[in-house]
């Protein structure tokens, strides 16, 4: 199919598309973090001793003892199961600019052949996937490809809702069997730790004594571009590289006035509302 015919077909598909129905958004206070196992939910679900320990781990990076990890895992599982979740996944961010996951189930069989749900602290803290599919700088042979996911308690677990079900997502880091970082989060956590150490040292030199843990924060990019899927599927550069590699040069003058401060098109507004609800 020629490029012109493909474009004409895309335009026809867009023209014939039925409008998307939009549900009235719920109150923000009702839906905010409803699928997140944050500190507020931990405080409600855990004993005072366990909550104090996990809160200290979240704020200072203090190691969590196995007994407390078991308590946190049990509370996390009960909360997730109560929301219809049967599976959990350690999610991490390898150096491929995409996410990676290792899925497991809460369901195990007992001696009577029945099914029960179980989730221990050891399952929460560490997983054992294969690391051979991820970039490694060619520093090891295939037989040394073992990698480990490790729970990052500084990021709250959350439930990913899809049309095919729900999964408890456990934010994790990914390292090699020798301890090297194999993801993008370990360097970030190490950078935050170094920044916190240096900043606290400066504050103490300035006479400050009551210093909390310092963290960095960043905001999402506010400018984005929406491309209709019919057009995107006809562009190999967008599909493979995620960017425009060929095409007409953009307008550099004031030829258009609908990009800044323009009225929001209906389809764009539908997208924005759906995205914000999620």
Say what each PLM segment does.
Residues 2-7, 59-63, 247-256:
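An N-terminal domain-start capping segment
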Residues 13-121, 125-143:
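Histidine/acidic residue-rich metal-binding segments in metalloenzymes
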Residues 4, 16, 38, 97, ...:
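Detector for Asparagine
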Residues 146-278:
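Glycine-rich, acidic/polar active-site loops that bind/position phosphate-bearing ligands
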Residues 2-22, 142-150, 156, 162, ...:
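N-terminal hydrophobic targeting/anchoring segments and the immediately downstream early-domain regions
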């Amino acid at each position: 199919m020629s490029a012109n015919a493909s474009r004409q077909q895309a335009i026809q598909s867009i023209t014939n598309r039925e409008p998307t129905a939009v549900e009235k958004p719920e109150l923000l206070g009702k839906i905010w973090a409803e699928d997140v196992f944050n500190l507020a939910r931990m405080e409600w679900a855990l004993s005072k001793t366990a909550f104090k320990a996990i809160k200290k781990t979240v704020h200072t990076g203090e190691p969590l003892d196995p007994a407390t990890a078991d308590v946190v895992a049990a509370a996390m599982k009960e909360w997730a199961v109560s929301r219809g979740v049967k599976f959990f996944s350690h999610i991490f961010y390898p150096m491929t600019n995409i996410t990676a996951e290792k899925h497991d189930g809460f369901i195990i069989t007992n001696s009577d052949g029945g099914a029960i749900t179980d989730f221990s602290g050891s399952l929460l803290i560490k997983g054992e996937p294969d690391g051979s599919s991820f970039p490694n700088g060619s520093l090891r042979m295939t037989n040394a490809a073992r990698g480990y996911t490790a729970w990052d308690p500084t990021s709250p677990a959350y439930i990913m809702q899809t049309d095919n079900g729900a999964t408890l997502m456990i934010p994790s880091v990914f390292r090699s069997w020798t301890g090297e970082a194999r993801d993008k989060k370990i360097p970030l956590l190490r950078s935050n730790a170094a920044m916190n150490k240096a900043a606290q040292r400066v504050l103490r030199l300035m006479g400050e004594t009551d210093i909390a843990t310092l963290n960095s924060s960043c905001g999402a990019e506010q400018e984005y571009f929406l491309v209709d899927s019919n057009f995107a599927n006809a562009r190999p550069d967008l599909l493979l590289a995620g960017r425009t590699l060929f095409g007409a040069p953009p307008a550099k003058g004031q030829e258009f006035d609908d990009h800044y401060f323009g009225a929001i098109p209906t389809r764009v507004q539908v997208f924005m509302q759906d995205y914000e609800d999620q």
